[in-house]
Amino acid sequence: MANTPQAKKRIRRNDRRAEINGNRVNRIRTFIKKVESAIAAGNKSEAETALASAQPELFRGVSKGVLHKNTASRKFSRLAKGVAALA
Protein backbone atom coordinates (compact mmCIF):
# COMPACT_ATOMS: atom_id res chain seq x y z
CA MET A 1 0.00 0.00 0.00
CA ALA A 2 1.23 3.47 -0.85
CA ASN A 3 2.38 5.46 2.15
CA THR A 4 3.73 8.71 0.75
CA PRO A 5 1.47 11.37 -0.76
CA GLN A 6 3.33 11.13 -4.06
CA ALA A 7 2.82 7.35 -4.23
CA LYS A 8 -0.90 7.83 -3.57
CA LYS A 9 -1.07 10.43 -6.32
CA ARG A 10 0.73 8.09 -8.73
CA ILE A 11 -1.84 5.37 -8.01
CA ARG A 12 -4.68 7.79 -8.81
CA ARG A 13 -2.91 8.95 -11.97
CA ASN A 14 -2.13 5.39 -13.10
CA ASP A 15 -5.79 4.42 -12.67
CA ARG A 16 -6.93 7.39 -14.77
CA ARG A 17 -4.39 6.68 -17.51
CA ALA A 18 -5.23 2.96 -17.56
CA GLU A 19 -8.89 3.81 -18.15
CA ILE A 20 -8.07 6.27 -20.93
CA ASN A 21 -5.65 3.87 -22.62
CA GLY A 22 -8.11 1.00 -22.31
CA ASN A 23 -10.76 3.09 -24.03
CA ARG A 24 -8.31 3.92 -26.81
CA VAL A 25 -7.45 0.27 -27.39
CA ASN A 26 -11.15 -0.65 -27.36
CA ARG A 27 -11.89 2.05 -29.95
CA ILE A 28 -9.11 0.72 -32.20
CA ARG A 29 -10.48 -2.82 -31.87
CA THR A 30 -13.93 -1.60 -32.88
CA PHE A 31 -12.59 0.00 -36.05
CA ILE A 32 -10.68 -3.18 -36.90
CA LYS A 33 -13.82 -5.29 -36.38
CA LYS A 34 -15.76 -3.05 -38.78
CA VAL A 35 -13.20 -3.71 -41.51
CA GLU A 36 -13.11 -7.44 -40.79
CA SER A 37 -16.89 -7.76 -40.85
CA ALA A 38 -17.07 -5.91 -44.19
CA ILE A 39 -14.40 -8.23 -45.60
CA ALA A 40 -16.29 -11.29 -44.33
CA ALA A 41 -19.48 -9.98 -45.95
CA GLY A 42 -17.62 -9.45 -49.22
CA ASN A 43 -18.61 -5.78 -49.40
CA LYS A 44 -15.60 -4.10 -51.02
CA SER A 45 -16.82 -0.49 -50.93
CA GLU A 46 -17.80 -0.72 -47.27
CA ALA A 47 -14.50 -2.43 -46.46
CA GLU A 48 -12.53 0.32 -48.20
CA THR A 49 -14.29 3.10 -46.31
CA ALA A 50 -13.92 1.21 -43.01
CA LEU A 51 -10.21 0.70 -43.73
CA ALA A 52 -9.78 4.40 -44.52
CA SER A 53 -11.32 5.30 -41.15
CA ALA A 54 -9.38 2.59 -39.27
CA GLN A 55 -5.95 3.68 -40.48
CA PRO A 56 -5.78 6.99 -38.59
CA GLU A 57 -7.15 5.31 -35.46
CA LEU A 58 -4.43 2.65 -35.58
CA PHE A 59 -1.63 5.15 -35.99
CA ARG A 60 -3.14 7.52 -33.44
CA GLY A 61 -2.78 4.61 -31.02
CA VAL A 62 0.91 4.51 -31.91
CA SER A 63 1.39 8.21 -31.24
CA LYS A 64 -0.51 7.93 -27.94
CA GLY A 65 1.64 5.01 -26.84
CA VAL A 66 -0.96 2.25 -26.65
CA LEU A 67 0.31 0.31 -29.70
CA HIS A 68 3.79 -0.40 -31.00
CA LYS A 69 4.35 0.99 -34.49
CA ASN A 70 5.17 -2.44 -35.91
CA THR A 71 1.96 -3.87 -34.44
CA ALA A 72 -0.14 -1.12 -36.00
CA SER A 73 1.63 -1.52 -39.35
CA ARG A 74 1.10 -5.28 -39.28
CA LYS A 75 -2.59 -4.96 -38.46
CA PHE A 76 -3.13 -2.33 -41.15
CA SER A 77 -1.19 -4.36 -43.72
CA ARG A 78 -3.25 -7.49 -43.07
CA LEU A 79 -6.51 -5.54 -43.26
CA ALA A 80 -5.41 -3.88 -46.52
CA LYS A 81 -4.47 -7.28 -47.93
CA GLY A 82 -7.93 -8.59 -47.08
CA VAL A 83 -9.63 -5.61 -48.73
CA ALA A 84 -7.45 -5.94 -51.84
CA ALA A 85 -8.37 -9.63 -52.12
CA LEU A 86 -12.03 -8.68 -52.59
CA ALA A 87 -12.77 -8.47 -56.28
Curated annotation (Swiss-Prot):
Any idea what this protein is called? Answer: Small ribosomal subunit protein bS20
Q: Which Pfam families match?
A: Ribosomal_S20p
Q: Which GO terms describe its molecular function?
A: small ribosomal subunit rRNA binding; structural constituent of ribosome
Organism, scientific name? Zymomonas mobilis subsp. mobilis (strain ATCC 31821 / ZM4 / CP4)
Q: NCBIfam families, alphabetically?
A: S20 (TIGR00029)
What InterPro entries does the record point to? Ribosomal_bS20, Ribosomal_bS20_sf
UniProt family annotation: Belongs to the bacterial ribosomal protein bS20 family.
Q: Which PANTHER family match?
A: 30S RIBOSOMAL PROTEIN S20 (PTHR33398), SMALL RIBOSOMAL SUBUNIT PROTEIN BS20C (PTHR33398:SF1)
The Gene Ontology CC terms held by the record are: small ribosomal subunit
Q: What does this protein do?
A: Binds directly to 16S ribosomal RNA.
**Which branch of life, at top level?**
Bacteria
User: Could you tell me the gene encoding this protein?
Assistant: rpsT
One GO BP annotation is: translation
Keywords of this entry: Ribonucleoprotein, Ribosomal protein, RNA-binding, rRNA-binding
